[in-house]
Amino acid sequence: MPWIQLKLNTTGANAEDLSDALMEAGAVSITFQDTHDTPVFEPLPGETRLWGDTDVIGLFDAETDMNDVVAILENHPMLGAGFAHKIEQLEDKDWEREWMDNFHPMRFGERLWICPSWRDVPDENAVNVMLDPGLAFGTGTHPTTSLCLQWLDSLDLTGKTVIDFGCGSGILAIAALKLGAAKAIGIDIDPQAIQASRDNAERNGVSDRLELYLPKDQPEEMKADVVVANILAGPLRELAPLISVLPVSGGLLGLSGILASQAESVCEAYADSFALDPVVEKEEWCRITGRKN
């Protein structure tokens, strides 16, 4: 069905209040967008980080009388009569089909493909991981996930144990198992991530070789030949003492979720325990790898 959207521009501090006003005026959903496309990379836990200059967009049913909506909003103390806004009619589309059409099989390195379930695999003889795009967890489209998948593809994982620290969808652990690892361990603070990893492992036929833990449940003694952590620079620095003990002597470490501008500080946190390789960059993100001393 067609929709009508009304867009307001405000400051991040006022965005929540105007969101409430739009909902009270009849909006069925609200979206916040940065006016200048400035990314937010690391909000604090529990924090909704908004931009200094924010567009608040309300979506309304096509039958809505927008004159009535504007009249209601004009009574809001932050807006007033003649407030600046933009109203647009959105064309009717099969949004689900359009969303699905945007996702195609993706190749990482020489052997590995990530394929959504509604697409045919490009190469039956390749290493194929079947994974559908979700709302919260990695599917390979982000540069940091791509960097980690390319790194795993470059390794000989035959018979190895791999730890995926901050496993999310389980994409890295599952890819490692499909690439020949004997066992993978996924750790995440989010129970939904643990469930997503379990479901994706079952879909790919590797659930019998994947162990999944919340941090409070993980074994005290865990070691692996390869450890990969695609989280964020802040946690990677703070958790360096914990992550650094996970690889066996001579084991490999791969870190991502790091902006190129943050690479130096993350390297410093691991330099005493690892012989680090040159940093690899993709867009504004990077990957740090090394071998345990």
Curated annotation (Swiss-Prot):
Gene3D superfamilies: Vaccinia Virus protein VP39. Its EC number is 2.1.1.-. It catalyses: L-lysyl-[protein] + 3 S-adenosyl-L-methionine = N(6),N(6),N(6)-trimethyl-L-lysyl-[protein] + 3 S-adenosyl-L-homocysteine + 3 H(+). It comes from the Bacteria. InterPro entries: Ribosomal_L11_MeTrfase_PrmA, Ribosomal_PrmA_MeTrfase, SAM-dependent_MTases_sf. One of its GO terms (cellular component) is cytosol. One of its GO terms (molecular function) is protein-lysine N-methyltransferase activity. It is found in: Cytoplasm. GO terms for biological process: methylation. S-adenosyl-L-methionine binds at residues 145, 166, 188, 230. Keywords: Cytoplasm, Methyltransferase, S-adenosyl-L-methionine, Transferase. Methylates ribosomal protein L11. Belongs to the methyltransferase superfamily. PrmA family. HAMAP family: Methyltr_PrmA. This is Ribosomal protein L11 methyltransferase. It comes from Escherichia coli O81 (strain ED1a).
